[in-house]
């Protein structure tokens, strides 16, 4: 199947002077030695810088810790894969037969890595100004989202504020089980709220993480 790279360029709103950069950025290691791994390394740093710079300028009153959490939220793998899906990136990847059969074009890690590689390709082809322009275009709806700062609050804090605003009782977290070897334990936590029928569960490598995941699950249930 022939891959139409011009269509992807239109979706990116960027025309490559050297299309070889884009081809390499779309090539998974399973498809050849000239793959996107080195591009991914470079793209990760470019993305981190551009987002950090944008957040620094947009939020002059935020602390270093707040800016770091916002950046981490915006450049995490799940977010990158989400953006990649929005532009249909999976349709343009060059994958080996094994990855193709196993659905690699849908895999979060592959989509995230490929998007970072494309950002590096744009930088190598058109410089930092071009890369910054494309990054800010891809992230525009997220950077402009009035709820962006909600990610500064952890799930337990968000759940508590939601319950207080809704006049509910505060949640109770119960450690129900610890399993696994001492160096690789898994903690199981249950979250319940008096007067609320829903029950939420969380598992993690420590109690704090398990409680956060249980709180997140409960909040998602309550908010429907």
From Swiss-Prot:
The keyword Heme does not apply. PROSITE patterns: DS_RBD (PS50137), RNASE_3_1 (PS00517), RNASE_3_2 (PS50142). SMART domains: DSRM (SM00358), RIBOc (SM00535). Keywords: Cytoplasm, Endonuclease, Hydrolase, Magnesium, Metal-binding, mRNA processing, Nuclease, RNA-binding, rRNA processing, rRNA-binding, tRNA processing. It holds the Pfam family Ribonucleas_3_3. One of its GO terms (biological process) is mRNA processing. Its cofactor is Mg(2+). The active site is at residues 44, 116. InterPro entries: dsRBD_dom (IPR014720), RNase_III (IPR011907), RNase_III_dom (IPR000999), RNase_III_sf (IPR036389). Residues 154-224 form the DRBM domain. GO terms for molecular function: double-stranded RNA binding; metal ion binding; ribonuclease III activity; rRNA binding. Mg(2+) binds at residues 40, 113, 116. It comes from the Bacteria. Gene3D superfamilies: 3.30.160.20, Ribonuclease III domain (1.10.1520.10). Residues 5-127 form the RNase III domain. It catalyses: Endonucleolytic cleavage to 5'-phosphomonoester. One of its GO terms (cellular component) is cytoplasm. Signal peptide: none annotated. The keyword Metal-binding applies. Homodimer. This is Ribonuclease 3. It comes from Legionella pneumophila (strain Corby). The lineage of its organism: Bacteria, Pseudomonadati, Pseudomonadota, Gammaproteobacteria, Legionellales. The gene is rnc.
């Amino acid at each position: 199947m022939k891959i139409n790279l011009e269509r992807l360029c239109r979706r990116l709103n960027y025309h490559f002077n050297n299309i070889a950069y884009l081809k390499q950025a779309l090539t998974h290691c399973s498809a050849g030695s000239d793959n996107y791994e080195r591009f991914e390394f470079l793209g990760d740093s470019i993305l981190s810088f551009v987002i950090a710079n944008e957040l620094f300028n947009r939020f002059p009153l935020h602390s270093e810790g707040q800016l770091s959490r916002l950046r981490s939220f915006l450049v995490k793998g799940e977010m990158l894969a989400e953006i990649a899906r929005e532009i249909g990136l999976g349709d343009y990847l060059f994958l080996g037969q094994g990855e193709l059969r196993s659905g690699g074009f849908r895999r979060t890690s592959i989509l995230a890595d490929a998007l970072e590689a494309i950002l590096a390709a744009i930088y190598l082809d058109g410089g930092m100004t071009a890369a910054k322009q494309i990054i800010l275009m891809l992230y525009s709806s997220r950077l402009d989202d009035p709820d962006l700062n909600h990610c500064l609050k952890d799930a337990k804090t968000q759940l508590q504020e939601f319950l207080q605003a809704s006049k509910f009782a505060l949640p109770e977290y119960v450690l129900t089980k610890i399993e696994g070897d001492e160096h690789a334990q898994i903690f199981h936590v249950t979250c319940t709220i008096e007067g609320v029928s829903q029950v939420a569960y969380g598992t993690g490598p420590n109690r704090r993480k398990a409680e956060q995941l249980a709180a997140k699950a409960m909040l998602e249930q309550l908010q429907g």
